[in-house]
């Protein structure tokens, strides 16, 4: 009730933050005259001065005004660009670990230099994260002269980069790269066999460009490094032949069956489900082709893998469409990012789905993969000490940024007011009518000399639009995932008078459409241009620029609404940059995916009530509101999926941190003899306790079993029964002590034979191998657990709590297995006197061979589809997402452990740590 009044009196929180920062802007401006008076050498020397002051204890916050003034002056001298006051506010926002929302054309790349320069002074490294390799290289090369003038080094990490180059890039003060590459390098580092093979330093400060795309859109899909498993290509081929014989079961809204079939498709949750008739039919067909034994069920324990293949085939045929979710390029299935429209070469779907699509397209089927390491962007980016980001559209997702990452969104005021006109949506009954109206709009704009950008949601739609325009004889350029190599060239000239560009969602994120075209690109295309040529190109551009402004600026036409309002706003934002004229219009039909699945009934009834005829369109705020409501519904569902992924991965993440900490400790240690001694004692205690129950009588002891277990686990044959017969005073504790001494003596004898140095090297290698193999198997087990855990909802159990409980049990077993298997291998194996350097070189060769076989998957989120049990109202504990790692508190020894076991920390993971 009083909120509007208080806001009017005191302003919004965002306005108050801007006012606070404006005071610092004034201090920065006060330094400007002093900086202008400095020579280049004196200005450059400021960096060394700042580093010295930091070494003496001065904070970055205190340095900020002077450092920003230095960066601004360097920008003027090197780039010919002076930071506006609002850009200084953007730089402060980044330094404070917040998200800066800035409109298109407001100079986000230049803003980043302020926060990056200041934080690079600490010497701990700064990562600048972009959405693709092109932008990483472009921004690094663009800003490199500025940073190098200021005495800072710049590196770029790219896929397939030689290790030496990549290591040098990470050692630089400022490192550019994509979110995928940073994430995969983190996983690779935790698979390395020596500290020298690692790339990344401690994760200090990251600036994420297009932060909404990376932290929101891509958060649903985990990063997975996998290796090849057994070949099942024949199985995929056979099942692919059977799938077309299955028919879809279709029901009307009232529940009346119009087509009885074998399976149902839910487009909202992107799931397929076999019904009873489908199960029976597929079992009969599998029996006929010899894949299922006579009388056996698909649900038998040993046939569950076959059932997974059937569902993968169904999904490949019914949910994945060529030129929408993927394209076929050079005999490979290449995935298309649904949010950006870009192809993702090298990325593969998990759970056999990629192989099923290859079978569907009659391509060579590549071997299935097994997970070697995985993480999510949510948990990776929360490892940074400080995280910040920039985008043109973050405010709609401010709640999620705060809930998941603890990041506040600051809306930075524009340098010039927005002059773009956003028209109401036009809704048609059919897609053909919609496309006809779009072409009429295009023709009208072209007669006025206006440039037009037509945005589409899929490659298929962009190609359909292109075909329609070709029939009309209208010249145009197409920008989609098939031709993204030409992206910069096409976008650069998309603002010329009368230019027509068809683009998917990838359209120039990070590349501005300049009205009149981009004169710098024209100059760059010339070999050794003369000053006269450059002057002429600038003059020609000025005329074209004025012509486009007078005609109304860039017209953005959208052929459909995306699931996310954010992506619609990004498309609109292509027009009206830096106060330029421009306009936008969305053309929709009831046949569009979003309308058909989420919003069609209400709008269709409204259109019927108006008595609309073929070819007519409706333009009404009520329709726009209905569509936005549908989008909010989809956004809410996607948020729930991302949140559920995080809640499950938080459990995995705690385990991942323990294993990676253990691994890094092993790698860094020169001598792990104490660790081996601890392992030996723990394994011996567990072995003795299994055969001699605590506080039991000697008659209850399984001495023969203990002798056998000692022989099996430690490679030593000990006459335990004889000891007991000969010594009446040998009870449980003294027996443990005697056994331990005998085992230590046997191991010392092995050390004398092999040599201490050789054995120390061998110990580290064995424990690393055992840890990696068991961790890989553990990840697979956790995947299977996650896939089936939602079924616990039917038993009125909380799936998330059940997952926590069972995963803790599995993890405890994993830690015991690491100790047990390491000791068993070390006890049985014969160690040769080998040159440790040769052994390490051999190990590195094996690691490199493994790396060549690795696949990098940005897979669909496993096991996170909304299960029926949850949708039907079974209560699920949806706790608020945890705070970022950088804010976590250290647990006291007597506090409850974070893993959910119910034990005190000192008796649980505190022991491990």
UniProtKB/Swiss-Prot annotation:
ATP binds at residues 87, 105-109, 512. SMART domains: SecA_DEAD (SM00957), SecA_PP_bind (SM00958). It comes from the Bacteria. Transmembrane segments: none annotated. Its cofactor is Zn(2+). One of its GO terms (cellular component) is cytosol. It is found in: Cell inner membrane; Cytoplasm. May bind 1 zinc ion per subunit. The keyword Plastid does not apply. SUPFAM superfamilies: Helical scaffold and wing domains of SecA (SSF81886), P-loop containing nucleoside triphosphate hydrolases (SSF52540), Pre-protein crosslinking domain of SecA (SSF81767). Its EC number is 7.4.2.8. Gene3D superfamilies: Helical scaffold and wing domains of SecA, P-loop containing nucleotide triphosphate hydrolases, SecA, preprotein cross-linking domain. Its main location: membrane. Zn(2+) binds at residues 897, 899, 908-909. It is a peripheral membrane protein. Keywords: ATP-binding, Cell inner membrane, Cell membrane, Cytoplasm, Membrane, Metal-binding, Nucleotide-binding, Protein transport, Translocase, Translocation, Transport, Zinc. The keyword ATP-binding applies. InterPro entries: Helicase_ATP-bd (IPR014001), P-loop_NTPase (IPR027417), SEC_C_motif (IPR004027), SecA (IPR000185), SecA_DEAD (IPR011115), SecA_motor_DEAD (IPR014018), SecA_preprotein_X-link_dom (IPR011130), SecA_SF2_C (IPR044722). GO terms for molecular function: ATP binding; metal ion binding; protein-exporting ATPase activity. CDD domains: DEXDc_SecA (cd17928), SF2_C_secA (cd18803). NCBIfam families: PRK12904.1, secA. Part of the Sec protein translocase complex. Interacts with the SecYEG preprotein conducting channel. Has a central role in coupling the hydrolysis of ATP to the transfer of proteins into and across the cell membrane, serving both as a receptor for the preprotein-SecB complex and as an ATP-driven molecular motor driving the stepwise translocation of polypeptide chains across the membrane. Belongs to the SecA family. Monomer and homodimer. Part of the essential Sec protein translocation apparatus which comprises SecA, SecYEG and auxiliary proteins SecDF-YajC and YidC. This is Protein translocase subunit SecA. It comes from Pseudomonas fluorescens (strain ATCC BAA-477 / NRRL B-23932 / Pf-5).
């Amino acid at each position: 009730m009083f909120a509007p009044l208080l806001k009017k009196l005191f302003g919004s929180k965002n306005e108050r933050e801007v006012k606070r920062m404006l005071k610092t802007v004034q201090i920065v401006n006060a330094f400007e005259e002093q900086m202008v008076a400095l020579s280049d050498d004196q200005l450059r020397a400021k960096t060394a001065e700042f580093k010295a002051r930091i070494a003496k204890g001065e904070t970055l916050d205190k340095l900020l005004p002077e450092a920003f003034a230095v960066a601004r002056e360097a920008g003027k001298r090197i780039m010919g660009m002076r930071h506006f006051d609002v850009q200084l506010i953007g730089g402060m926002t980044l330094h404070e670990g917040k998200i800066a929302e800035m409109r298109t054309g407001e100079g986000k790349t230049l803003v980043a230099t302020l926060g990056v320069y200041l934080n690079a002074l600490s010497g701990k490294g700064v990562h600048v994260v972009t959405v693709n390799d092109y932008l990483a290289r472009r921004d690094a090369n663009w800003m490199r002269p500025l940073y190098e003038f200021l005495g800072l080094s710049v590196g770029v990490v790219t896929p397939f980069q030689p290790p030496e180059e990549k290591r040098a890039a990470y050692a630089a003060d400022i490192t550019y790269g994509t979110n995928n590459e940073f994430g995969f390098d983190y996983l690779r580092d935790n698979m390395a066999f020596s500290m020298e093979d690692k790339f990344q330093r401690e994760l200090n400060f990251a600036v994420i460009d297009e932060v909404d795309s990376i932290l929101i859109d891509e958060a649903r899909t985990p990063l997975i490094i996998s290796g090849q498993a057994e070949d099942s290509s024949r199985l995929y081929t056979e099942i692919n032949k059977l799938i077309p014989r299955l028919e879809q079961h279709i029901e009307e809204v009232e529940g009346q069956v119009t087509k009885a079939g074998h399976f149902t498709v839910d487009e909202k949750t992107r799931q397929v489900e076999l019904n009873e008739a489908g199960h029976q039919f597929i079992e009969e067909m599998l029996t006929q082709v010899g894949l299922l034994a006579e009388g056996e069920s698909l649900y038998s324990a040993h046939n569950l893998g076959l059932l997974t293949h059937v569902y993968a085939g169904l999904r490949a045929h019914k949910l994945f469409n060529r030129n929408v979710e993927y394209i076929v390029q050079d005999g490979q299935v290449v995935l298309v990012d649904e949010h950006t429209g870009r192809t993702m070469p090298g990325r593969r779907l998990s759970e056999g789905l990629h192989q099923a699509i290859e079978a569907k397209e009659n391509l060579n089927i590549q071997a299935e993969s097994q997970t070697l390491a995985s993480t999510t962007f949510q948990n990776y980016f929360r490892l940074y000490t400080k995280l910040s980001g920039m985008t043109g559209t973050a405010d709609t997702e401010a709640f999620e940024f705060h809930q998941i990452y603890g990041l506040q969104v600051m809306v930075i005021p524009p340098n010039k007011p927005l002059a773009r006109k956003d028209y109401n949506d036009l809704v048609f009954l059919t897609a053909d009518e919609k496309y006809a109206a779009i072409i009429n709009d295009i023709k009208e704009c072209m007669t006025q000399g206006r440039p037009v950008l037509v945005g589409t949601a899929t490659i298929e739609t962009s190609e359909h639009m292109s075909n329609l325009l070709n029939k009309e004889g209208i010249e145009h350029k197409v920008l989609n995932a098939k031709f993204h190599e030409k992206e910069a060239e096409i976008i650069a000239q998309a603002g010329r008078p009368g230019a027509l560009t068809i683009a998917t969602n990838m359209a120039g994120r990070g590349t501005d459409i300049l009205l009149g075209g981009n004169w710098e690109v024209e100059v760059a295309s010339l070999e050794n241009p003369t000053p006269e040529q450059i002057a002429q190109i600038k003059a020609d551009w000025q005329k074209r620029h004025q012509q486009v402004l007078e005609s109304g600026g860039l017209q953005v036409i959208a052929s459909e609404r995306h699931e996310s309002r954010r992506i619609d706003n990004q498309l609109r934002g292509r027009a009206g940059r830096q106060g330029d004229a421009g306009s936008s219009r969305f053309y929709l039909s009831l046949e569009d995916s979003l309308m058909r699945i989420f919003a069609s009934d209400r709008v269709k009834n409204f259109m019927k009530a108006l008595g609309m005829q073929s070819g007519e369109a409706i333009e009404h705020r009520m329709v726009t509101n209905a569509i936005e409501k549908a989008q909010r519904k989809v956004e809410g569902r996607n948020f729930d999926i991302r949140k559920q992924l995080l809640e499950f991965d938080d459990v995995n993440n705690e385990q991942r941190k323990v294993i990676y900490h253990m691994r890094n400790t092993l790698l860094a240690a020169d001598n792990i003899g104490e660790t081996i001694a601890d392992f030996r004692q723990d394994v011996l205690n567990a072995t003795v306790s299994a055969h001699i129950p605590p506080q039991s009588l000697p008659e209850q002891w399984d001495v023969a079993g203990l002798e056998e277990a000692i022989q099996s686990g430690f490679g030593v044959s000990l006459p335990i029964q004889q000891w007991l017969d000969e010594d009446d005073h040998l009870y449980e504790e003294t027996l443990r002590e005697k056994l331990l001494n005998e085992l230590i003596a046997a191991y010392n004898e092995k050390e004398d034979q092999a040599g201490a140095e050789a054995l120390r090297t061998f110990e580290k290698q064995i424990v690393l191998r055992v840890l990696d193999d068991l961790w890989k198997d553990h990840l697979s087990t956790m995947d299977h657990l996650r896939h089936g855990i939602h079924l616990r909802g039917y038993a009125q159990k909380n799936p998330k709590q059940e997952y926590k409980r069972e995963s803790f049990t599995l993890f405890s077993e994993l830690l015991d297995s690491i100790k047990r298997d390491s000791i068993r291998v070390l006890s049985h194996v014969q160690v040769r006197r080998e040159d440790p350097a040769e052994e390490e070189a051999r190990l590195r060769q094996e690691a490199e061979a493994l790396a060549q076989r690795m696949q990098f998957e940005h897979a669909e989120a496993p096991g996170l589809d909304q299960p029926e049990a949850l949708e039907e109202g079974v209560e699920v504990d949806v706790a608020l997402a945890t705070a970022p790692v950088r804010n976590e508190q250290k647990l006291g020894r007597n506090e409850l452990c974070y893993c959910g076991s119910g034990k005190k920390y000192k008796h649980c993971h505190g022991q491990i740590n």
